[in-house]
Amino acid sequence: MRGRELPLVLLALVLCQAPRGPAAPVPGGQGTVLDKMYPRGNHWAVGHLMGKKSTRESPYVYEEGSLKQQLQGYIRWEEAARNLLSLMEAKGTRSHQTPQREPLGIRQSAWDYQDDSNFKVIGPTREVGGLSASGSQPEGRNPPRN
């Protein structure tokens, strides 16, 4: 052990051996398992709450002038929740409707191979891997300059 850790270890040993004072009496043998686990009863949070008596820093404490703003905020949230609920209900009723189905034999393909108006005729050269068959640059591209 180092010299700095020795005082901490001694302090821990002294605190563990300190006698219990009358501030937290433990009934001898009487009580439930929870009483034995938490001998101080419902006052366990007192140490955590000490020093928290100031309410000025709390964001939940509103001054008198802002009470109206607080109520308006609640009303906005309530309206937003109602709108969201109505949208969800509308979507739910639409999703439960059965879709109109066509017989499988009459179904028309989404891509009409008869209509070739969207194709562009380029000519006899074919492009493979970015180069044309004749070795020249593809149409519309400038040759690289060194």
Swiss-Prot record:
Q: Which GO molecular function terms does the record list?
A: neuropeptide hormone activity
Leader sequence range is 1-23
Q: Where in the cell is it found?
A: Secreted; Cytoplasmic vesicle, Secretory vesicle lumen; Cell projection, Neuron projection
- GO biological process: what's one of them? mast cell degranulation
Q: Which residues form the propeptide?
A: 54-146
Q: Which keywords does the record carry?
A: Amidation, Cell projection, Cleavage on pair of basic residues, Cytoplasmic vesicle, Mast cell degranulation, Secreted, Signal
Q: What does this protein do?
A: Stimulates the release of gastrin and other gastrointestinal hormones. Contributes to the perception of prurient stimuli and to the transmission of itch signals in the spinal cord that promote scratching behavior. Contributes primarily to nonhistaminergic itch sensation. In one study, shown to act in the amygdala as part of an inhibitory network which inhibits memory specifically related to learned fear.
Would you say which domain of life the source belongs to?
Answer: Eukaryota
Chain positions covered by the region annotation Disordered:
91-146
Q: Which GO terms describe its cellular component?
A: extracellular space; neuron projection; secretory granule lumen
The family classification in the record reads: Belongs to the bombesin/neuromedin-B/ranatensin family.
* Methionine amide found at: 50
Task: Name the major location.
Answer: secreted
Q: What is this protein called?
A: Gastrin-releasing peptide
What PANTHER family does this protein's entry cite? GASTRIN-RELEASING PEPTIDE
